[in-house]
């Protein structure tokens, strides 16, 4: 082959690679509409284990307040809510000691890592300003809450893990990207 042909092929490959690399990431959450049963069973087992542990604490100085309902599905707030829940769950589960982890906790951590990356990609695609609040809407002021102990915080995140995986992540997958 002549040098000009090689140059043309090289230029074509360079353009192709540049276009592929510059292509925006897609927001793909549809595969979280139904999760692998083994992962859900591991999340249930972890929750049950922590429930038994919490009952053995004696004095109940943890207040497991019910969570507010997640934001409406038409807003980017749901994706941000799910992203915060995933980050909390990853932090707590990766900080557990070996004795506290169940054998099936590995798939939970893998699922959380993948879901965290996918939700972050969806949030990156959101146009700036699309999730702004309605002008004039006032934020309710809440009394400052007493901070929970690390043990209570860990138990709360573990108790809410199943809800995060089976309800909140699924709703985010059904609602699609926020644009």
Swiss-Prot record:
GO terms for cellular component: cytoplasm; extracellular space. InterPro entries: IFN-lambda_sf, INF_lambda. GO terms for biological process: cellular response to virus; defense response to virus; innate immune response; positive regulation of immune response; type III interferon-mediated signaling pathway; tyrosine phosphorylation of STAT protein. GO terms for molecular function: cytokine activity; signaling receptor binding. It is found in: Cytoplasm; Secreted. Its main location: cytoplasm. Coiled coil: none annotated. It comes from the Eukaryota. Residues 1-21 form the signal peptide. Cytokine that may trigger an antiviral response activating the JAK-STAT pathway and up-regulating specifically some interferon-stimulated genes. Belongs to the lambda interferon family. PANTHER family: INTERFERON LAMBDA-4, INTERLEUKIN-28 AND 29. This is Interferon lambda-4. It comes from Homo sapiens.
């Amino acid at each position: 082959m002549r040098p000009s042909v090689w140059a043309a092929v090289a230029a074509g490959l360079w353009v192709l690679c540049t276009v592929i690399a510059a292509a925006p990431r897609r927001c793909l959450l549809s595969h979280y509409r139904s999760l692998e049963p083994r992962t859900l069973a591991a999340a249930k087992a972890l929750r049950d284990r922590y429930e038994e542990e919490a009952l053995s604490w004696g004095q109940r100085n943890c207040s497991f307040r019910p969570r507010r309902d997640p934001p409406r599905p038409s807003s980017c707030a749901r994706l941000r809510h799910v992203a915060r829940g995933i980050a909390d769950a990853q932090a707590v589960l990766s900080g557990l000691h070996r004795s506290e982890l169940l054998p099936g906790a590995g798939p939970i951590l893998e699922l959380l890592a993948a879901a965290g990356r996918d939700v972050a990609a969806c949030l990156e695609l959101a146009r700036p300003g699309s999730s702004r609040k309605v002008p004039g809407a006032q934020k309710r002021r809440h009394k400052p809450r007493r901070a929970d102990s690390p043990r209570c915080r860990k138990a709360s995140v573990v108790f809410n893990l199943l809800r995060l995986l089976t309800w909140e992540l699924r709703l985010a997958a059904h609602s699609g990207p926020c644009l």
